[in-house]
Structures are given as C-alpha cells and as structure tokens.
C-alpha cells in the first residue's frame, strides 16, 4: 500500500490537487503512529504534518479557525492534521479551556459551515476518528509511565483522561452530531489494535481515490473495525438510551 500511496501523491502533484486529512481521537488512540506510517514513504516536499501548539495570547483574540487556515493545502500538497480545530470539540470543553458558549453556541454551529467552505474549495477532505477503549487507553498510559523513552508523551491532560472518560464520550457524541455531514463525513477506526488501525487507515484512503496505474482492490474494508460517523452515532445512541438522560454525565457507559 505504501507504493500505491506514493502513486497517489505523484498524481496529486501532477494534477495540482489538494488533499487534507484530519486524524482525531482520544489520548493514546494511536494517532501519531498512524500518521508516521501514512507518510513513511511519501515525498516530504509534497506532504506536511500540522500539529499546532496551544494558541498564543494573540491567537486567542482571533477568529477560532483563523490559525488553521494558513496550514490548509496548496495545489499539489497533502496536509495531515495531527489533531485540529476539533480540540474545541473535545479536550477544550472537557478540561474547561473554553466556555460552554464557545463550544456549543459557536464551534458546533460554525464547524459545518467552515468545513463546507473547505470542501467547496476543491480540497479532497478526509476526517478520521481513532477510537480507543478505556481499558486499552489505561494500558497505554501505564506503558508510558514505565518507559523513560515514552514518558514525554504523558501530559497532565492525558492523566485526567481516564477520570473524565464519560465527559469525553459525551463531547465526542456532540461533535459527531454537529459535524458528521454528507459533504464532510467522519470515518471511525477502532484502534485498540494499532497495527490493524494503521492498515485500515491506508486502505480506506486508497479506496476513495483514483490515480494512474492503480493496482489492488482496496474496497474490502474491515467493517468490524471501521464504520461511518452515522453508524457510530447510532451505536452511541443505543447505549445512551440505557441511562436516565438527567444522569448521563455521571453514569454513561464506556461507548468507545
């Protein structure tokens, strides 16, 4: 599949196409490893990874999406966001880094409009959410704590992820409801098995694009590990219905 990805990149450059890939998910979902595998053999001159730091004091005064616009792909480019504007749909509201109004009244209302503008700008747009279970996340955190070479990956925010699991689940549900649209849909990839998740990512992308001398059938996606945003919403709602809506914040089930 790496050869096929390189063929696709060559076609992107030759035709002046623009490709944008968002990789989202909880902490320890395997986002970084998947991106590393995705770009492993791509030409770095035509491929960029965007992983922005927390906003500066100046950026905090700007339109929320402004800092991301400068990083969108130009003709011939593939751009991969390692987390994106969806920080405001997950970690920011859960950790109190933004107000409820900034989250619900602005972001969740505006993000479909913003992404429609991206889609209407002839950008090939993918949105992936890597879904890790609570138990697997806990195991990953324990490995990071015990491995000096991985301890840098464990932040104070990460360490609260288990405690705030249910709130992150509700935030994910709100995000999918607001931003899973026909023009910019989500694809959910189960990532407890990191190797399979990476392979499914590559396979899914290749199944959705065409380029000269394409070889191989990539249409057989593992439906046990990959689903649409719409399917994920249905799964989450089936679990949510088991709980009194007034107590959902406290008693929601492990939905990932």
Predicted feature residues:
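Glycine-rich phosphate-binding loop of ATP-dependent small-molecule kinases
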Residues: 1-256
């Amino acid at each position: 599949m790496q050869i096929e990805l390189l063929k696709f990149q060559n076609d992107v450059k030759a035709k002046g196409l623009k490709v944008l890939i968002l990789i989202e998910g909880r902490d320890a979902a395997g986002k970084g490893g998947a991106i590393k595998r995705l770009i492993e053999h791509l030409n770095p001159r035509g491929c960029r990874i965007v992983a922005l730091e927390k906003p500066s004091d100046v950026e905090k005064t700007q339109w929320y999406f402004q800092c991301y616009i400068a990083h969108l792909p130009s003709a011939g480019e593939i751009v991969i966001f390692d987390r994106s504007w969806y920080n405001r749909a997950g970690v920011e509201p859960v950790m109190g880094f933004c107000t409820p109004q900034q989250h619900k009244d602005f972001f969740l209302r505006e993000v479909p409009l913003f992404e429609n503008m991206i889609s209407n700008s002839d950008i090939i747009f993918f949105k992936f959410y890597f879904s890790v279970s609570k138990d697997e996340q806990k195991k990953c955190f324990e490995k990071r704590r015990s491995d000096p070479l991985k301890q840098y990956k464990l932040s104070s925010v990460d360490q609260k992820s288990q405690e705030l699991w249910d709130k992150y689940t509700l935030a994910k549900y709100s995000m999918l409801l607001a931003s899973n649209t026909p023009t910019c849909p989500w694809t959910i990839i189960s990532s407890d098995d990191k190797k399979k998740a990476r392979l499914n990512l590559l396979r899914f992308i290749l199944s959705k694009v065409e380029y000269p001398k394409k070889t191989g059938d990539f249409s057989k996606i593992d439906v046990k590990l990959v689903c649409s945003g719409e399917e994920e919403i249905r799964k989450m709602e089936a679990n949510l219905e088991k709980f009194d809506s007034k107590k959902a914040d406290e008693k929601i089930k492990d939905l990932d």
